[in-house]
């Protein structure tokens, strides 16, 4: 079955949200980061957006089974052209696919299609992913991203034109 890694736990731990803030988990997968955040910040209202129907269904079922169905809403959709999510959000958190597309030297994707989609960039490269997240964010909102250190320059290039206050928190 699906197992969550440490990345979504660290992502959720880095989010600061005040009472009533709305948080989007962009590319939520099975909801691990959203559930960690909901457990830590019971006042937050969280929406998870996931392109893969099976993962979105599993995340929605998990929210209900864990008593979080009223605070964690899962929506199936594409970040590149999202459905109406009620944006803008106070916080957008995201754990984008870590693997660059194969044609960009990203290596061989996992053989299972769901994992390949979750782990490898597809129609949205990293810069497009970040720009899509920024479009869903309120003015002066927070974007929280977890990614590999070797992609830091790409991340900074994607946020620099529109973000003012940038903090990089190394995770060792």
Where would I find each of the regions flagged by the language model?
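Conserved Class I SAM-dependent methyltransferase catalytic core
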Residues: 4, 122-172
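Mobile active-site "lid"/loop adjacent to the S-adenosyl-L-methionine
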Residues: 97-128
């Amino acid at each position: 079955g699906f197992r969550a890694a440490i990345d979504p736990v660290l992502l959720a731990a880095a989010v600061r949200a005040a009472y009533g803030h709305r948080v989007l988990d962009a590319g939520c997968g099975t909801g691990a980061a959203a559930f960690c955040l909901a457990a830590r910040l019971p006042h937050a209202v969280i929406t998870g957006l996931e392109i893969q129907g099976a993962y979105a269904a599993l995340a929605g079922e998990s929210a209900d089974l864990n008593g979080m169905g009223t605070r964690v809403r899962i929506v199936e959709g594409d970040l590149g052209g999202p459905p109406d999510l009620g944006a803008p959000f106070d916080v957008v958190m995201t754990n984008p696919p870590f693997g660059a597309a194969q044609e960009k030297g990203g290596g061989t994707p996992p053989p299972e299609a769901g994992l390949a989609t979750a782990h490898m960039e597809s129609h949205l490269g990293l810069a497009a992913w970040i720009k899509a997240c920024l479009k869903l964010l309120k003015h002066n909102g927070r974007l929280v991203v977890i990614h590999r250190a070797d992609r830091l320059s790409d991340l900074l290039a994607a946020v620099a034109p529109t973000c003012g206050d940038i903090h990089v928190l190394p995770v060792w």
